[in-house]
Amino acid sequence: MKLTLWTYEGPPHVGAMRVATAMKDLQLVLHGPQGDTYADLLFTMIERRNARPPVSFSTFEASHMGTDTAILLKDALAAAHARYKPQAMAVALTCTAELLQDDPNGISRALNLPVPVVPLELPSYSRKENYGADETFRALVRALAVPMERTPEVTCNLLGATALGFRHRDDVAEVTKLLATMGIKVNVCAPLGASPDDLRKLGQAHFNVLMYPETGESAARHLERACKQPFTKIVPIGVGATRDFLAEVSKITGLPVVTDESTLRQPWWSASVDSTYLTGKRVFIFGDGTHVIAAARIAAKEVGFEVVGMGCYNREMARPLRTAAAEYGLEALITDDYLEVEKAIEAAAPELILGTQMERNIAKKLGLPCAVISAPVHVQDFPARYAPQMGFEGANVLFDTWVHPLVMGLEEHLLTMFREDFEFHDAAGASHHGGKAVAREESPVAPADLAPAATSDTPAAPSPVVVTQASGEIRWMPEAERELRKIPFFVRGKAKRNTELYAAHKGVCDITVETLYEAKAHYAR
């Protein structure tokens, strides 16, 4: 156990809540002390759901610790069934309740309720949230789904979408459209939007689409064994992956590949004149394994970025992520410590970060552009608009999402480049009002360690980092710093790094304007 101000994943019972909240007519009963979890806040504030999550609590207190707390769980189960009348129920223990070793399986059986009650085994001290969601969904599918006759037409199940998932709602809609172009209907989408009665119909489909391995792979593997349903292995995030996904579906079903790329813009836009701003941009990627692997492929092969670092916080995806990282000559970072992630980002010196809400905070601290690609996320990443990550429309959304932080418009570049101009500095006023511009008095450049931090409105100018060499330390002269700030900030970091490398190679301690332009000429060859 450790004290931290950020965690990428909650305990396993949070994953159970995500599955229960995604479904209809299912009630989850959590056995735990008062204040041990916070279901309402997660789903009504962050995801902005218009209904409270279907979660009930036994809520024992300190005064109950010397008594039989199992009675409280028994009463909570009976009360939840009487009040909500669900089609099925699930029961789980929170972290603290696990220490008491109450038996939810035996208690639920003794009640003899008229609906299925699925006990969940969620080891709170060795596993985390994604495992909890995956195991909860698997347990529900195992308890309710049975083999049955297939539908006359080719159908599939969509597996893995949950509450609090990153763009899961829109991904389901986009994948449904993709499959419809091949004449394939969706039999059941689960857990998102499904009821326990819907889970009983899972066996009717011809195959399963595994949308999110983190939360649906165990259920997909169970259905493969129990109902003889194959499942897809490719996640359709990005243009190439979407085409590969449709080819995989064609191989499973025997249907011809039919695609509608009439609305796809990402490939052309990536190859357009603006691609000169994109090609070679250094990018660091961190998040859940599925989204990181997909993002690395898009960044390297579809947009033209250089992937300089990648990692994930969920250890269940460590093996496939290490395999993917090796393709780019990288060693994968597998950690759930945000401080380690921050150190890795600083060491990699990227020009763009793709990550979670935590990486957005790290990017603000370091003055780097960032785009969110993976849960956990905050309220702004649950948009009211349609914004999928999967399919061809998802590729368009990803292109916009990644490029916008780089500030493609020339306005900001020009404002930064001419910040010191006599007509455009802050004290001159608006030039289009006909004011009389007066040249501002030059002030000496503050030392690197005393320079004020960049505001949120002004892109951070990279303060000269002192690099210690055998011959002494490298310093930026004031006139060189001023010249560096005239370089558009979307390439300023690269120019700064190249200049310092050139100076170190030449044994130059003081970087002047001449050094800056010599380095530019050297690396332009």
From Swiss-Prot:
The keyword GTP-binding does not apply. It catalyses: chlorophyllide a + oxidized 2[4Fe-4S]-[ferredoxin] + 2 ADP + 2 phosphate = protochlorophyllide a + reduced 2[4Fe-4S]-[ferredoxin] + 2 ATP + 2 H2O. InterPro entries: ChlB/BchB/BchZ (IPR050152), LI-POR_suB-like_C (IPR013580), Nase/OxRdtase_comp1 (IPR000510), P-CP_red_C (IPR042298), Protochl_reductB (IPR005969), Protochlorophyllide_Rdtase (IPR016209). GO terms for molecular function: 4 iron, 4 sulfur cluster binding; ATP binding; metal ion binding; oxidoreductase activity, acting on iron-sulfur proteins as donors; oxidoreductase activity, acting on the CH-CH group of donors, iron-sulfur protein as acceptor. Binds 1 [4Fe-4S] cluster per heterodimer. The cluster is bound at the heterodimer interface by residues from both subunits. [4Fe-4S] cluster binds at residue 36. NCBIfam families: DPOR_BchB. Component of the dark-operative protochlorophyllide reductase (DPOR) that uses Mg-ATP and reduced ferredoxin to reduce ring D of protochlorophyllide (Pchlide) to form chlorophyllide a (Chlide). This reaction is light-independent. The NB-protein (BchN-BchB) is the catalytic component of the complex. This is Light-independent protochlorophyllide reductase subunit B. It comes from Rhodobacter capsulatus (strain ATCC BAA-309 / NBRC 16581 / SB1003). The lineage of its organism: Bacteria, Pseudomonadati, Pseudomonadota, Alphaproteobacteria, Rhodobacterales.
